[in-house]
């Protein structure tokens, strides 16, 4: 385990909560391949008090009445999205990897380092004008996020916000998503 450093904190959750979050993000070297430093958020999810503070802070940041549904991006985004949806009293909609949804779905592909991946959302996931908060655990290059934002709009939703727990600022995801606002609790 190596130390995680907070280089920037954004949002209304506050520095104290962000520092607690940072202390619960573990660096796992050489995962999933040599040379990659994986940021493991599972200890954060396992700490009920800190996780509750994070979820409540995100709901406060946007306001309970500013979104009608929460989209979670497969897979760890499901954990965060479901908790936010529950706290706000709205529904949760999964954006899944290709072939995982049982009904007719929209799909969007995005580039990976060596290939391409595809995400899907049910075509009937939203009604026209549905305000949707899009949530993921980590923002890296922004490919997954951009594909998801495009899917929400194709399915009739209006993106009310995009939030992540951890932004890997050095990978440029925020710039890729511009001019959309990105709410990141913690940026490294």
From Swiss-Prot:
Transmembrane segments: none annotated. It catalyses: AMP + diphosphate = 5-phospho-alpha-D-ribose 1-diphosphate + adenine. Pathway: Purine metabolism; AMP biosynthesis via salvage pathway; AMP from adenine: step 1/1. Its main location: cytoplasm. InterPro entries: Ade_phspho_trans (IPR005764), PRibTrfase_dom (IPR000836), PRTase-like (IPR029057), UPRTase/APRTase (IPR050054). One of its GO terms (cellular component) is cytoplasm. It is found in: Cytoplasm. One of its GO terms (biological process) is purine ribonucleoside salvage. Keywords: Cytoplasm, Glycosyltransferase, Purine salvage, Transferase. GO terms for molecular function: adenine binding; adenine phosphoribosyltransferase activity; AMP binding. Its EC number is 2.4.2.7. Pfam families: Pribosyltran. HAMAP family: Aden_phosphoribosyltr (MF_00004). NCBIfam families: apt, PRK02304.1-3, PRK02304.1-5. This is Adenine phosphoribosyltransferase. It comes from Salinispora arenicola (strain CNS-205). The gene is apt.
């Amino acid at each position: 385990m190596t130390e995680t450093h907070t280089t920037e904190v954004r949002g209304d959750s506050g520095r104290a909560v962000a520092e607690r979050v940072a202390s619960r993000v573990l660096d796992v070297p050489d995962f999933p391949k040599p040379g990659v430093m994986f940021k493991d958020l599972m200890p954060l999810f396992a700490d009920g008090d800190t996780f509750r503070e994070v979820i409540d802070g995100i709901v406060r940041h946007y306001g309970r009445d500013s979104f009608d549904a929460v989209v979670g991006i497969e897979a760890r985004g499901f954990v965060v999205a479901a908790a936010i949806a529950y706290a706000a009293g709205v529904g949760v909609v999964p954006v899944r990897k290709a072939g995982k949804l049982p009904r007719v779905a929209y799909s969007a592909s995005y580039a990976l380092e060596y290939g391409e991946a595809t995400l899907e959302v049910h075509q009937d996931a939203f009604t026209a004008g549905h305000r949707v908060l899009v949530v993921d655990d980590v923002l890296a290059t922004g490919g997954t996020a951009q594909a998801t934002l495009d899917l929400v709009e194709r399915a009739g939703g209006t993106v009310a916000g995009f939030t992540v727990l951890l932004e890997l600022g050095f990978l440029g995801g925020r710039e890729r998503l511009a001019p959309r606002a990105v709410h990141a609790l913690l940026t490294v």
